Amino acid sequence: MQDLKIKCVADSKCMLGEGPVWDEINQDLYWVDILGNKIFRYDLSSKTVDWWETPEHVGFIVLKKGGGLIAGLRTGLHQLELQSNNKVSGRRIDRVDENTDHIRFNDGICDSRGRIWGCTMDMNQEAPLGKYYKYNGELSRTEVDKGYVVANGPALSPDGNYLYTVETVGGAALNKGIYISELKDGATVKGKQLFINWNKHSKSTFPDGIISDAEGNLWIGEFGGNVLRCFS
């Protein structure tokens, strides 16, 4: 693997910046400020940054075919349109906060089949209330995993046969670390195992966002360490 150099392209001063999404067609980079309730977009050609306020904490966004975004907000999955006044408009598609004020979407991705995989967390970071959900192309929800205090990711292997999930803080149910599960027929999760025990790697930092590259390497943002880790 060649040496990589990291540089700042947009000093957006986020409270909790996460979830980069690349728009290949328009050559734009999107990301969210979860606690700042904002969506950002960086235009590669003009090197300018635009932003939009969201009505709730925004855990992740994915690009919607035909325009607009699907976003995991605090109370659930929303369809959003970006407006010219730094605001968003839209509607809630699905509610996942279970009628509590301390559950929210924390992270999520769209896979090559157009399915959305999203996860929730306990905002108090105490109880194993976090879950992983899968939405099909019609945005019908299926619960695929549970028992996380702070869930992150997930990531899928390049062949789509394995799902990687993250327990960021750890608790009575799950150790802090990365978990791997088999995806039967690319859909049904089974056989979850601890893949990377983070406490053996670091007791003072936390595994956060995760992605798998074309070679099957796992890239993990290390919260509290200001480091991007690659596991192969």
Residue spans for each PLM region:
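A short beta-strand motif characteristic of beta-propeller blades
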Residues: K5-D11, K47-E53, R91-E98, L139-K146, ...
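Flexible "stalk/tail and boundary" regions
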Residues: L44, L82-N85, Y133-L139, V227-S232
